[in-house]
């Protein structure tokens, strides 16, 4: 992969003799991302092997450049407005939105993106526009490795996870709660303006629901798979 050189980093893990994450730096300055597009298949193959890729030194200085970088991979866009995620986020471009609008002191733990909904993206791209002076790390975990270890230690539990799945419950406010990591309003989450439209959308998704005081809406998903195997 002549466009990129591999680079080791602190705390890099190795699983089945592969680095996690794989760290790539351009071998020369890129004026645009045409070369990335040309090497898309090779990069996606590396992603399937390593589980995550960290790109450094690619000249991504703002949301527009990040949008161009993501577009170079030729992947179908997953618009946030069409998702059922309950995080408050702002679109910066059609493909780029903020990770979360919650205050800095709200801790967000490891999770699969939108796994608590029937709609979720296949791939995720993250970009750090401004590095934090202190902290600010984004932790990563190889789910396949975690699953293998859980199967070895708690096989019956994993069997039950496969068998039963899980139902997720949450409460959505009538107006976005900017102080919460999960404060997206039911209007924005469901893409509706009225209670009647919200109930129709929830029924189409096989959700259960009940209305609460102050225009809040409590919902519970149908049983969703706890373990999925996706293609590369």
Language-model features: locations:
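Non-heme Fe(II) oxygenase catalytic core, chiefly the N-lobe of the double-stranded beta-helix
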Residues: 1-232
